[in-house]
């Protein structure tokens, strides 16, 4: 019986966070480490018969972070089907995070590469908002 449950979509796949981080995700992870913020990678949230994974979960703050790379979420030309699926997945994640009581912070590749200090300010600001609510 255990094998069936473990292999089903009732439980999130194991060891998901062992997927290598992208360079952009590594930048955010390093920032979170520098800020001494405890986080987990690839936070699963149940959606219908499957799971949606969020890049980072700030454990003590109820904040999820998605790092949006330029290819999938940016201005680069891409097939309309790819753009449509990325937009649909983003909308689902936005809704799911809100439904589950998380604040979702989206960080664009351009922000990380061109204005890194703003990323630090955004994350710190959301943490401070969360602390003032509690």
Regions found by a protein language model. Name each.
Residues 1-134:
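Nucleic-acid endo/exonuclease domains
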């Amino acid at each position: 019986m255990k094998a069936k449950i473990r292999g089903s979509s009732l439980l999130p796949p194991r060891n998901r966070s062992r997927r290598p981080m992208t360079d952009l995700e590594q930048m955010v992870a390093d920032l979170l480490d520098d800020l001494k913020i405890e986080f987990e990678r690839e936070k699963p949230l149940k959606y219908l018969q499957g799971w949606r994974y969020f890049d980072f979960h700030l454990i003590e703050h109820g904040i999820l972070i998605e790092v949006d790379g330029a290819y999938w979420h940016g201005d680069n030309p891409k097939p309309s089907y790819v753009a449509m699926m990325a937009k649909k997945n983003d909308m689902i994640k936005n809704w799911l995070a809100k439904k589950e009581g998380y604040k979702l912070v989206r960080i664009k590749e351009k922000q990380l590469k061109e204005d890194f200090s703003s990323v630090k300010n955004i994350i710190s600001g959301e943490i401070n908002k969360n602390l003032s609510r509690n």
